[in-house]
Amino acid sequence: MRKETLIGLAFITANVIAWSLRWRMQKSTTIAAIAGCSGAATFGGLAGGIVGCIAAGILAILQGFEVNWHNGGGGDRSNPVKRSSDSFSIVNHNGEKVDSYAHLVPGKVGKVIIDNIELSAIRYANNHTSLGYHFTSDGSGPAARGEATTIWGVGADEAIDKGTPSKNDLQNMSADLAKNGFKGHQGVACSTVKDGNKDVYMIKFSLAGGSNDPGGSPCSDD
């Protein structure tokens, strides 16, 4: 296995361990992003830097999912619960803060802010929500959409009503993504969190420069 790949996976493993031990201070994901993007790029070159950024993006997205599940306000609920955490917020395309993914205007690009890390957010007509973590093609840090490679996490909003994944489920999902890597023409990794025999949430990460619709990525719903 190439040196930069090993370094990138080491950053992912470190992030997963830190997350599972609840080393989740206000600036934890910012530190992870700095370590993943600059550290891996320094020691592992281009590929290592990109994989390190992916690690930070996965960590931030998973933390956001946990906050969403545990504090409510997801899906199509008529009375969404306001979040108590100052480290998590959802902002519509016009800059207005909203209480739920369900309040995002379909097709418009809003954002989710988790511990000062911004993720782009799009709600589709089928009520699926995509979260994107943008970083430059050289892995040096966040970038504008036009010059960024994007990681997308995809899942159905209504899944929040089917059960709450455990922390172990989320940790296993991140580990599964790290283990399997990014495959296929667009570099796709998929994982499903399950509650008993029911599929609760499928997350799909796709490296696709300039893409803002991950729906065509080859992930199975099984």
UniProtKB/Swiss-Prot annotation:
Domain of life: Eukaryota
Keyword Signal part of the UniProt annotation: yes
Gene name of this polypeptide: SMK1
Pfam families: SMK1_alpha_su, SMK_beta_su
Keyword Signal in record: yes
Job description of the protein: This toxin kills sensitive strains of yeast.
Protein's name in the database: Salt-mediated killer protoxin 1
GO BP terms: killing of cells of another organism
Note: The full activity of this toxin depends on NaCl or KCL. Its maximum activity is found at 2M salt solution.
Membrane-spanning intervals of the chain: none
Cystine connections: C37-C53, C190-C219
Keywords: Cleavage on pair of basic residues, Disulfide bond, Glycoprotein, Signal, Toxin
Coiled-coil spans in chain: none
Signal peptide: 1-18
GO cellular component terms, semicolon-separated: extracellular region; protein-containing complex
Subunit structure: Heterodimer of an alpha and a beta chain. The fate of the gamma chain is unknown.
Glycosylation sites: N127
GO molecular function, one term: toxin activity
